[in-house]
């Protein structure tokens, strides 16, 4: 179980054990479901164990697919040439810098249970929230870079996990670029199956209601995965409802927006405004991720908008 402000304690032994076994569970479910569906490639026991407990990705992902992983594993290791060594080393150094310089520095001023109750200035509360938003990004993406760099040194090309998520113009694109392998896993093994199940019901369900149920349920489950607490539940529901609202809003305004954005300047206005709005929506959600109490979290939200 994770607690609030988890990213600042990400090196604790209990947390590493929790994360490691949760990622093992993802890999086990992936292989079991694909075996049942007849999609699992033929692998021997040593290959399977290597995939499940592959040490660079054990504690924080990314969540690789076994068919892609085995393909790399079976390639004869030709040693390290200059290009591979440089690329892997560069990725490793970038990850270390992100985690231990940028993220750990931001942690000094990032939102937490202590300063959330001590700071009453709206301006400084926004600074704390921004600091936490970037701390968690550089912390997590830094660990991913470290994992990718180490894996590349031993001949395994793990999948990317982050692609500038804070520069995306809507919440759907944010989740397609934040912890991408987790999003893909939940889409494949939870979202898509329950969507098919709802469509096969004898009693038809409206498309908006189906989208609401599937998106909220998926994000709530992702929240539970981080920890069975009210704050993680609220965080999951926040994103589930946000995804649903974006879906409905996009369907309603797509034609009008396309008509209005007839010039590159107007397209830039839409894109930049979308990026700013999406980032702030995500940043407000991080408040429930950073803090351990719903009451404290809501008080911070109110103070951010000048309501004391």
Model-based region annotation:
Residues 1-5:
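Short, exposed "boundary/linker" segments that immediately precede the start
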Residues 8-308:
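Membrane-embedded transmembrane alpha-helical bundles that form the catalytic cores
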């Amino acid at each position: 179980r994770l607690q609030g402000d988890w990213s600042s304690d990400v090196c604790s032994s209990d947390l590493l054990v929790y994360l490691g076994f949760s990622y093992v569970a993802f890999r086990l479910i992936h292989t079991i479901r694909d075996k049942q569906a007849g999609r699992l490639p033929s692998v021997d026991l040593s290959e399977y164990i290597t995939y499940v407990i592959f040490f660079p990705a054990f504690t924080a992902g990314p969540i690789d697919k076994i068919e892609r992983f085995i393909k790399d594993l079976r390639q004869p290791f030709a040693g390290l040439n200059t290009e591979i060594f440089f690329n892997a080393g560069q990725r490793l150094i970038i990850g270390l810098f992100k985690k231990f310089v940028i993220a750990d520095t931001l942690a000094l001023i990032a939102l937490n249970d202590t300063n959330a109750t001590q700071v009453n200035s709206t301006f400084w509360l926004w600074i704390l929230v921004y600091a936490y938003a970037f701390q968690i990004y550089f912390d997590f993406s830094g660990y991913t870079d470290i994992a990718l760099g180490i894996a590349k040194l031993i001949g395994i090309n793990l999948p990317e996990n982050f692609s500038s998520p804070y520069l995306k113009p809507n919440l759907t694109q944010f989740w397609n670029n934040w912890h991408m392998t987790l999003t893909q896993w939940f889409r494949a093994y939870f979202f898509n199956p329950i969507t098919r199940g709802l469509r096969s019901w004898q009693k038809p369900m409206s498309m908006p209601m189906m989208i609401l149920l599937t998106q909220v349920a998926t994000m709530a489950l992702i929240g539970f995965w981080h920890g069975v607490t009210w704050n993680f539940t609220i965080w999951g529901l926040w994103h589930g409802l946000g995804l649903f609202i974006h879906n409905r809003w996009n369907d309603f305004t797509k034609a009008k927006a396309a008509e209005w954005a007839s010039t590159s300047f107007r397209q830039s206005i839409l894109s930049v405004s979308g990026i700013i709005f999406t980032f702030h929506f995500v940043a407000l959600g991080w408040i429930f991720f950073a803090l351990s109490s719903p009451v404290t979290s809501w008080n911070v939200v109110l103070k951010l908008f000048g309501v004391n």
